[in-house]
C-alpha cells in the first residue's frame, strides 16, 4: 500500500544518509483512527486492508512495531474507544509512546480518566484547544504527576508566530509536533 511504501522509503532514505533505523531513526505515527472509524469498525477499504475491530487493530499495531522502528503512535483508536486505547497501551506502552489527542483534547477531566484507566501514556497538548494557558499547564502538571509524556502541538490554521516553540521549551517536555517544513507557508516553529 502507499503508506507501507512511504514508511519503507523513509527508513531507506535515512539509512542512505548514514543513520541506523531503530538506533538513530524512529517513526512516530499519527493514525487519526477516528477518521476511518465507521459503525463500530475501522475501515481500510481504500488501501485494501478491509475492516478491522479493536482487537484486529491492536494486532495491526503490534505487527507494525515488529516491522518498523516505531517510537510513538498517536490516536491508534477512535476517540470513544477507551478500551481499545487501553489494550494498545497495555500491549505496546512499555516500548512505544501511546499518545491521546482526540481522546483527551487537552482536557483535564479526560486526562484524569485516561490515567485511571491506563488508556495511554502520553497526551498531545494543544494550547488553544482547552482555552487558557493555566488550563493547559494544569493538564501538563497532571501528566507529569502520572509519569506520562506530553507533546506540545500546533493546531492547523494557526499563525506564523513562534510562541508554540517557546512554550514547548518552557514546559520542558522535550517534544513538539509541528507541520512539515515543506507544507508550511513559514516553518518558523521548526527554525525557532
Please identify what each model-predicted range represents.
Residues 1-7, 11, 182-192:
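Single conserved hydrophobic/aromatic residue that forms the stacking wall/gate
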Residues 14-184, 188:
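Catalytic core of soluble alpha/beta enzymes
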Amino acid at each position: 500500500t502507499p503508506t507501507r511504501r512511504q514508511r519503507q522509503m523513509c527508513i531507506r532514505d535515512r539509512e542512505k544518509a548514514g543513520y541506523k533505523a531503530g538506533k538513530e531513526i524512529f517513526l512516530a505515527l499519527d493514525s487519526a483512527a477516528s477518521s476511518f472509524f465507521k459503525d463500530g469498525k475501522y475501515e481500510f477499504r481504500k488501501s485494501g486492508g478491509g475492516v478491522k475491530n479493536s482487537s484486529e487493530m491492536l494486532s495491526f499495531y503490534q505487527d507494525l512495531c515488529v516491522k518498523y522502528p516505531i517510537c510513538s503512535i498517536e490516536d491508534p483508536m477512535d476517540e470513544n474507544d477507551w478500551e481499545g486505547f487501553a489494550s494498545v497501551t497495555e500491549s505496546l506502552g512499555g516500548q512505544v509512546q501511546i499518545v491521546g489527542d482526540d481522546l483527551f483534547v487537552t482536557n483535564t477531566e479526560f486526562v484524569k480518566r485516561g490515567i485511571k484507566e491506563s488508556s495511554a501514556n502520553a497526551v498531545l497538548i494543544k494550547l488553544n484547544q482547552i482555552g487558557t494557558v493555566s488550563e493547559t499547564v494544569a493538564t501538563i502538571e497532571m501528566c507529569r504527576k502520572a509519569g506520562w509524556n506530553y507533546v506540545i502541538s500546533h493546531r492547523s490554521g494557526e499563525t506564523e508566530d513562534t510562541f508554540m516553540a517557546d512554550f514547548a521549551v518552557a514546559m520542558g517536555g522535550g517534544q513538539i509536533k509541528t507541520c512539515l517544513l515543506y507544507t508550511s507557508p513559514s516553518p518558523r516553529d521548526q527554525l525557532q
